């Protein structure tokens, strides 16, 4: 509920409605310096997942943002990755782990399903992953999408754990 309160407080000022061929959503980016507690939460969740499963080198959070997908505009995000790739770029830090916290109850919306694609296999959310407060982590290079919201609104908080470029 605290995260929803932060979103509500910020939503009146710092929102960006993103409409493109790839996505339709309202995003609110958190100022890292003003919301250290939220960054710390995302980092601790990413660290636990990393220690339990991934074993990547991570040491920071890129930033966090709220995403609101609304039935009014069939809010969605098409297949994409959160990681720019293994190519040489000017960036020293790379996104390595994506962290999604579900902030809506599953009864508040229809559609809006987070799907992950592994090779030719698409993994859909399990019902317990739809509950408000549930956390989903995955490597930032895994292709994923949010299907169109057909009824209601879906709110989530997303953050990315980063580390030095891949070797």
Describe each model-derived feature in a short phrase.
Residues 1-135, 141-167:
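Fe(II)/2-oxoglutarate oxygenase catalytic core
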